[in-house]
């Protein structure tokens, strides 16, 4: 049981003063379940987070894929995270 690398999405629109991030990861829990951890907010802030727990990895991956699809549909794009840029929430 290992965690999958997080998916980091960003949405920027200077005309609307918008700079947002959305991080989605699938991680094992201490109880043998899987958690989809979502972390979001304005770039430069600590943001908010929420966890959803699932009994099996396939269900957690499906939930993660659903959130990624919704966010990409709203204009979020992939952001490549270099180790030096990683937000503290990902370390």
Describe the residue ranges of each PLM region.
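A broad, low-specificity signal for short, low-complexity segments enriched in glycine/proline
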Residues: 1, 11-15, 40-41, 72-74, ...
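Short N-terminal "domain-start" leader segments
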Residues: 1-35
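Intrinsically disordered, low-complexity and often Lys/Arg-enriched segments
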Residues: 1-6, 78-91
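Short aromatic-glycine-(Arg/Gly/Cys) micro-motifs in beta-strand/loop hairpins
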Residues: 24-51, 65, 77, 83
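Alpha-helix boundary/capping detector
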Residues: 50, 62, 86-90
């Amino acid at each position: 049981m290992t965690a999958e690398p997080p998916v980091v999405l960003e949405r920027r629109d200077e005309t609307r003063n918008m700079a947002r991030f959305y991080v989605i990861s699938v991680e094992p829990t201490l109880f043998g379940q899987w958690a989809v951890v979502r972390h979001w907010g304005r770039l430069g802030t600590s943001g908010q987070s929420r966890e959803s727990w699932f009994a099996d990895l396939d269900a957690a991956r499906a939930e993660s894929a659903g959130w990624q699809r919704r966010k990409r549909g709203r204009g979020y794009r992939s952001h490549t995270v270099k180790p030096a840029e990683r937000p503290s929430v990902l370390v």
